[in-house]
């Protein structure tokens, strides 16, 4: 089993490549996250077009549709009430409506993810490996910052908290809580049997590294 298909330039490979960048974009920041989401949505719409919406819809999907529809209607209604307020002094703006409409992109993102999972386009092993690599990187960078009072990028440490590659943003612990779970499941799911001693040993070591980093990060 290879990480990608034999042909490098394929639709599935490009889609998976953007998914592999997810843990990295969270380290870089919001601009990278939003850009990656935009490219992911745009590319999948171009590649798969209407097929994205030809999935088996379940009860949970309907609940999610209702939720997003409620958010949209609520945003439009609030904006209408604001515009109809004759006693309003400050200038009108469409920020609330804009945010409501932009929020709908997450519904589209959900449908796309449902599609690529249902059609087995996503390469879970590659995604788990990517999450594991960046989780270990963040953990080791926190250790480095803890020992030398600055990380490998030169970000200084704090007396009580260490952010690693996140600089002034104290979110390293939250990052590890989200992405290190893939590290713990990598060997049991994709490389070694869950009862294998080597698998248990490697998983335990990675767990201790992540846990220690979370504690150090504050």
How would you name each of these model-derived features?
Residues 66, 72, 97, 130-133, ...:
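Alpha-helical hydrophobic/aromatic positions enriched in membrane-embedded helices and signal peptides
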Residues 82-91, 150-161:
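Membrane-interface helix termini and inter-helical loops of multi-pass transporters
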């Amino acid at each position: 089993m290879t990480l990608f298909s034999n042909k490098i330039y394929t639709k599935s490979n490009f889609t998976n490549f953007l998914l592999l960048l997810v843990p990295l974009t969270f380290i870089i920041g919001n601009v990278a996250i939003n850009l990656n989401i935009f490219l992911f949505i745009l590319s999948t719409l171009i590649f798969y077009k209407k097929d994205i919406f030809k999935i088996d819809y379940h009860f949970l999907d309907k609940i999610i549709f209702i939720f997003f529809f409620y958010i949209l209607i609520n945003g439009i209604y609030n904006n209408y009430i604001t515009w109809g307020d004759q006693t309003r002094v400050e200038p009108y703006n469409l920020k609330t409506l804009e945010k409501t409409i932009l929020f709908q992109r997450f519904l589209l993102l959900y449908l796309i993810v449902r599609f690529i999972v249902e059609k087995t386009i996503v390469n879970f092993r590659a995604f788990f490996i990517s999450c594991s690599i960046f989780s270990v990187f963040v953990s080791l960078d926190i250790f480095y910052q803890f020992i030398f009072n600055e990380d490998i990028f030169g970000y200084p440490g704090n007396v009580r908290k260490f952010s690693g590659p996140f600089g002034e943003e104290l979110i390293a612990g939250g990052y590890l809580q989200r992405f290190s779970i893939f590290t713990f499941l990598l060997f049991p799911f994709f490389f070694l049997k869950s009862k294998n001693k080597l698998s248990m040993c490697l998983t335990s070591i990675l767990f201790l590294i992540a846990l220690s980093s979370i504690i150090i990060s504050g």
